[in-house]
Amino acid sequence: MTGGFTTVYGRNLVAELPNFVHRPYLVVTMDDLWPRFSTSLDGPGMAAVHRVRTLDVSELEGIVDDLPACASVIGLGGGQAVDVAKFVAWRRRIPLFQVPTAMTVNAPFGHRSGLRRDGIVRYLGYAVPEAVYVDFDVIASAPAGLNRAGVGDILCYHTAHLDWQLTRDLGREEPQWPYDERLVTAAGERLDSVLGALDDIHDVTDHGIHTLMEAHRWGGDTFHASGWNPRHIEGVEHFFFYNLERRTGRHFIHGQPVGFGIVLGSVLHGSGTDEMVAALHRVGVDIRPEAMGVGWDDAEAAMRTLGAFVREAGLWHSIADERPVDDAVVSEVRDRIVAAYGAWESTS
């Protein structure tokens, strides 16, 4: 149904970049990554390195204006780095080369940047990379938790489909996004591929990397290929994540709050909770609030205020519009997660 961006799988790919990207090039990356890759990219062909500090659109506008002249941009990192690289490429109208360093999200394969405006996620801009370079050794060397968390952006298809089917059944479809079984089926194939490779993804084998990144490749591209339609790939589980992020002011490893949201959405729909909890636990994504650096009180507040949040943010229709999160829902979500992962034991 969609081909996605040109994607190159291999090894020693970062060191080759200075030999062919347009010069001078800007590297967009993170503080913790640059020391590792600077020897491969720093040199006479580099215009500058930008270390991402913010995803706020108003701040990024000024940052992009102040960056030095460059002929291309290399996005090197996880979701934040590649999203900012897309934004720079779009604003400067220059070629883009993406190098994900972990499998955390599908951002390297998406056209728009997931940024923040007034604390709410907004997808802005449009950039198509010359290629996405997936280096097996680079990915495998990332913290295992980051790589495993990438399944959140695929397992979320489960709750997204439940939301879209509910919207159809209630006659509340958005005019631009009528229910499309073909999209649901295509997304389901990617979901099944990841569910069938959970052990390889957990161990970050070449097969696990290829399986999850190919699913991300499809997921990142289909938003545009389906006419900017998010309904088959994102729903209430992401809305919970956005609300938790806004309420706490924290940045999270994407798949952890999304994984928690998948459990919440499954409980609200009354469908597939056991399967989703088992998959998240088996692959090694710890969705307990404490593992994210917050408490159960934060998670509970984000659950209970979800209905108000989706209306305030103008998000598309989901189970959050139809079923309030009451004591029974909160208790079931907590019980399911604690039963699978155990109670949190502080190491302090």
How does the language model describe each region?
Residues 19-20, 65-68, 122-127, 131, ...:
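Solvent-exposed alpha-helices and their adjacent loops that cap or buttress functional pockets
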Residues 154, 163, 167, 171-173, ...:
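C-terminal charged capping/lid subdomain of soluble metabolic enzymes
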Residues 179-290, 294:
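Active-site segments that bind and position negatively charged phosphate/pyrophosphate groups
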Residues 1-72:
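ATP/NTP phosphate-donor binding region
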Residues 90-190:
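A glycine/threonine-rich phosphate-anchoring loop and its flanking beta-alpha core
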Residues 67-88, 92-103:
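A short, small-residue-rich loop immediately preceding and capping a beta-strand
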